[in-house]
Amino acid sequence: MAVGLSQVSIMGNKGPLRDTRPAQLPHKESGTRLRSQPLVLTHRFPTEVHRVGELVDILLEARELDPKDAQELGLALRELLLNAMEHGNLEITFEAKSNALQQGSWKRILAERSTSLPYRSRETHVTAHWTPDCVAFTIADQGKGFDWRALPDPTDPDNLLLDNGRGVLLARLSVDSLTYNEAGNVVTILKRLR
């Protein structure tokens, strides 16, 4: 007998994201976050970089997780959501971010881009496929994408001090699989659960 998938859709807005969850989303307190049931969740988040930590918490609330799995997934999701928002939706290049950080103008540039058209209306779409033994997250931004094959190898001694690619490396080391689509604006991670 096949087990049906539960589907829940969550959309963030300018208000508190936690208040937008539908009542049928399994909650820790209710004891309904059973790992034996497959679950598909879809989310649409506004490009609000300062709320990435809160978004990660929302994404991980669906299931009770082993603490190490939660830590590793949290790290991967944080890095990939930041990339999707900053470099994807806001189209801020790695070089522009590095320069802004060095000059102390990063917060200003981020605020300006976040309120300018067409960037301010862009969203990050996340789909989570939970099964009893693994989870897959697909993160899609509305930017132009990037050539993920051209990321410098952050483990190469010549690149150790570069900022570019470090978040992707951290994410890759935290999950079992990380793949991009051809355009580079959709990334999928897979993590086997303990």
Task: Give names to the regions the model predicted.
Residues 2-75, 86, 90-114, 127-129:
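Bergerat-fold GHKL ATPase/HATPase_c domain
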Residues 27-40, 85-194:
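Conserved beta-strand-loop-beta-strand hairpin that lines the nucleotide-binding pocket
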Residues 77-78, 186:
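Alpha-helix N-cap/helix-start and coil->helix boundary motif
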Residues 79, 83:
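Conserved polar catalytic motif of the HATPase_c/GHKL fold
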